[in-house]
Amino acid sequence: MNYDIYNSSITYFPLLPLSKTASFERKVLDIRQMPAQVLFPHWDDEFEFIYVLSGMMEFRVRQKAFLVSSGEGFFLNTGEIHSACTYQSYDCRFVIYRICPSVLFQTEDNPLYQKYIKPLVDHPSFGFLTFVPKVPWQKYILEMIRKMNDICDRPVDGYELKINHFVNEIFYYIFHNV
C-alpha cells in the first residue's frame, strides 16, 4: 500500500461546525463513499469517539497505523492529526462522535474539570486510545458508544441528556484506567 497520501497537506476541516447550542455531532460514514476512499489527514477542535459499525479500515494517528474491525473504536483528543482509508477490499461503515469539551463541564475553571479532565487531555502522551472488546473496561466503553448510536438512531425528547451522561461515564472509565 502506498502511504504517500499521509504526507500530503494536513488541514483542519470539521465535519460540520458545531453550533453554540450543540454539544456533540454524530456522523455515520462509509469509507467507500468518500473521495478516494480516504478520510484525509485532519484534526478537530473537539474530542472524537470513532466506532466501526461494520467491516474494517486502516486508521492512522501519531505515525501509527491500526486495523480497526467491526465493534472496535478509538478516542481522539483535541488537535490529534488522524486519517483513515480502506483496508484491502473491505467495506467499512463507521460512526464519528465529535464532542465539545463543554459536555463534560461548562467552563474550564470548574474544579472537577481541573482535577479529572484537564490532566488527561493536556498530557502529551494522551493523544488517542484504542478500544477493543477483549479488554473489559474498553468493552464497557464500546457498549456505551453503541447505546449512544441507538439513541441517536431513534431520538426522543431529552436524548441529548443521555448522550451527555454516556460521555461523562466514558471519561470516568478513561480516567480510572489510563
Language model features with spans:
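A conserved hydrophobic position in a structured secondary element of the catalytic/binding core
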Residues: 76-77, 99
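A hydrophobic/aromatic-rich effector-binding and dimerization subdomain
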Residues: 2-24, 85-149
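Generic protein-terminus/edge-of-domain signal
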Residues: 1-67, 73, 80, 114-115, ...
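Short histidine-centered beta-strand/loop micro-motifs
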Residues: 37-44, 85-87, 107-109, 159
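Residue-level recognition of conserved beta-strand edge/terminus positions
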Residues: 77-79, 85
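An amphipathic alpha-helical interaction segment
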Residues: 132-178
